[in-house]
């Protein structure tokens, strides 16, 4: 079987924090391989990354970023900011452009301020208030465009992110809609949850 994969990941930045959401379905051709893949990985207690693409590549990049964050903390005595980590990740991806990591990444965090960025496989870096990646992006971005407000609460952003991923899952066969991983990051820290739907 040819391995065809897809997903939808979403990021929303607010004045009080960042919300990341992703489906948990992995596909093998036209078959659902599992409903329990974590597509959002914490790097520190204040920064996480999502991926659309190769989960193995994401895991390798996450290990690199974790090591760099620990080294930075040890060297400078303070945590690496999400903006600095996004720039570091951009450089790592760009250095590998001839043998690219097969990923589209969203990085979000709150160290000194809320930060959200998306990166393409060659290291292209865009900081934004909201973004999506993956095969369900055309559906998810429409929900974000319609519902995003700069002054919205974390809870409203969480609901919007879940709605965006679920909507994508209803229209994109490679995005799951039954279980959604959500990570919320504020100045108080990070909270991870899994939201499940019966239908």
From Swiss-Prot:
The formation of the proteasomal ATPase PAN-20S proteasome complex, via the docking of the C-termini of PAN into the intersubunit pockets in the alpha-rings, triggers opening of the gate for substrate entry. Interconversion between the open-gate and close-gate conformations leads to a dynamic regulation of the 20S proteasome proteolysis activity. Its EC number is 3.4.25.1. One of its GO terms (molecular function) is threonine-type endopeptidase activity. It is found in: Cytoplasm. Keywords: Autocatalytic cleavage, Cytoplasm, Hydrolase, Protease, Proteasome, Threonine protease, Zymogen. GO terms for cellular component: cytoplasm; proteasome core complex, beta-subunit complex. Residues 1-6 form a propeptide. GO terms for biological process: proteasomal protein catabolic process. Signal peptide: none annotated. The active site is at 7 (nucleophile). It catalyses: Cleavage of peptide bonds with very broad specificity. NCBIfam families: arc_protsome_B (TIGR03634). Belongs to the peptidase T1B family. This is Proteasome subunit beta 2. It comes from Thermococcus sibiricus (strain DSM 12597 / MM 739). The lineage of its organism: Archaea, Methanobacteriati, Methanobacteriota, Thermococci, Thermococcales. The gene is psmB2.
